[in-house]
Amino acid sequence: MEYFDIEEVSSKILHELLQYRRRFPESEHTIQYEENKVSEVQLPRIRAFVEQGKPIECILPAFPTKSPNPRKVLGKMPDMAEKLSLMFLNSLCQRIQLYYPPGAKIIICSDGHVFSDLIHVDDNTITDYQVEIEKLLHESGATHLSVFNLGNVESLTQYTDDYDQLRELLVKNYASSTEEIKAILKENEEGLLLYRAITRFLYEDSLLPEYTGSKNALQKDARQRSVGVIQRSWAWGNLLAEQFPQAIRLSIHPQSVESLKLGIHMMPTRDDWLTPWHGVAANINGQFVLMKSDEVKNLQGKLIHIRGVPSHYVIETESERNQEIEPIAEAVHAG
């Protein structure tokens, strides 16, 4: 096997990931302080793969399903936002392989079925979305990526293939009680930020154009469902830790510096919480950025179709709108 410096290569791989780390907004610490703390957790885990000359195995709970709210997304199926994110993840693995021949692989642990009833998206829609994600991987030649979902968990599917029952088994075997979840979330600011972010997602996703009820009632419902989503999400994380005990645990959300999880961006965004399935890809000055559909429409974005299917937007930077566009472009380049 080709010789390489274990410490140097391990540090280089970690640096590759740190370039895209999601931070908590308004963190009181410097980036250098945070990265030193993250390194204390992640470097030994990366080094364990390098010492054995094995591919770096990462897991990423992500790509559940599209938001049901047309104010945020283009439709129910993956579009340019997902495509660009998958291409980024695959290219990340390819870059690692340039200086570490065993390379890296990322297992996308699609979690839509884990909480479909709580996010008000039916299981058939989620299955269709996941099938399209796998098609995108195949069509784009993303050989470093693979997909794992609730239906692939043999320790659960040996009993049933019904998703309602699979969710019950997941909670029974891997979840803490909602009371324990609430107590943990209240322990620190990061827990509260997560709770508020999930609540906001659920509220926005339920604020459909045809909704005529009270916004206060919708907010209350979102707060109640938020704890359940976090409970299921953490249960899924516990299951994944059992299935892939050595894997580097990536996340779509900002994480504390002491966490085993490392939050990463998959494409530029103005929001440290926004994801491809909660937004659309908008091309601004030749660079794609994640935004909500309504935000793009307010900037007179032009909808682009590929093979007759809505794909993404292009925002032309006309002089009279430069004042609106510039803060977005600056945020993109800063990210």
UniProtKB/Swiss-Prot annotation:
This protein's UniProt keywords: Lyase
Top-level taxon of origin: Bacteria
A Gene Ontology molecular function term of the record: lyase activity
Consequences of knocking out this gene: Deletion of isnA and isnB abolishes rhabduscin biosynthesis and decreases virulence of the strain.
Keyword check for Lyase: yes
Spans through the membrane: none
Listed Pfam families: DIT1_PvcA (PF05141)
Catalytic reaction(s) noted: D-ribulose 5-phosphate + L-tyrosine = (2S)-3-(4-hydroxyphenyl)-2-isocyanopropanoate + hydroxyacetone + formaldehyde + phosphate + H2O + H(+)
Entry keyword Lyase: yes
Family matches, as Gene3D superfamilies: 3.30.60.140
EC number: 4.1.99.24
InterPro entries xref list: Isocyanide_synthase_DIT1 (IPR007817), PvcA (IPR017133), TyIsonSynPvcA (IPR054921)
Main function: Involved in the biosynthesis of rhabduscin, a tyrosine derivative which is a potent inhibitor of phenoloxidase, a key component of the insect's innate immune system. Responsible for the synthesis of the isonitrile group on tyrosine using the C2 of ribulose 5-phosphate as the source of the carbon atom.
PANTHER family, sorted: SPORE WALL MATURATION PROTEIN DIT1 (PTHR37285:SF5)
Family: Belongs to the isocyanide synthase family.
Protein's UniProt name: L-tyrosine isonitrile synthase
UniProt source species: Xenorhabdus nematophila (strain ATCC 19061 / DSM 3370 / CCUG 14189 / LMG 1036 / NCIMB 9965 / AN6)
